């Protein structure tokens, strides 16, 4: 039986990977591919006051809360970030994220720039943020239209919002232009691989290097 390689056994903190983009730029598609192909990642499950849809499963899609319970979590400091969208509240529970990161497990956040800013403020040393850009606004419109999920009015609103969202690109650690989905996905995976190797995230390196220096090869 082969023993694990030294690099695989060195203790590390997890990565909090934040993916943001305007609607239609490919953020959610890349997030799904990452979860399917990289089993070190877990998707952060948000809490929400929105009513559960028939197809949704508690604890898988969301943790569904009453308004009172949500406010208690918010006021008690139990949320890393939260926002109100279309009259419903959404937030990221603090406890599961902190336990995962301390245990060396990586967490994926598919959130907008406002949520990313709140996470960056709460856990700045653990965040790796990537902003996904469309190659052109014309292509963004084409993607939104091809989805056939929204009315022309909603598509127009999404395009207007996209301008403001794209203006936040400088706040992110990395920017990936999604002109080819496979290339964009490969870029995100390369970012993740490099960030996992940062020595600041690998407290176990201290003991490994000390042991390495203490060796006396025959």
Swiss-Prot record:
Binding, ATP: 21-28
TM region(s), chain numbering: none
Gene3D superfamilies documented for this protein: Guanylate Kinase phosphate binding domain, P-loop containing nucleotide triphosphate hydrolases
CDD domains listed in its UniProt record: GMPK
Keyword Transmembrane helix: no
EC code(s) of this entry: 2.7.4.8
Principal localisation: cytoplasm
Top-level taxonomic group: Bacteria
Recorded GO MF terms: ATP binding; guanylate kinase activity
Occurrences of domain Guanylate kinase-like (ranges): 14-193
Signal peptide: none
Compartment annotation: Cytoplasm
Top class in the EC scheme: transferase
This protein's UniProt keywords: ATP-binding, Cytoplasm, Kinase, Nucleotide-binding, Transferase
Reactions accelerated catalytically: GMP + ATP = GDP + ADP
Keyword Zinc: no
Family: Belongs to the guanylate kinase family.
Function of the molecule: Essential for recycling GMP and indirectly, cGMP.
Entry protein name: Guanylate kinase
Gene that this sequence comes from: gmk
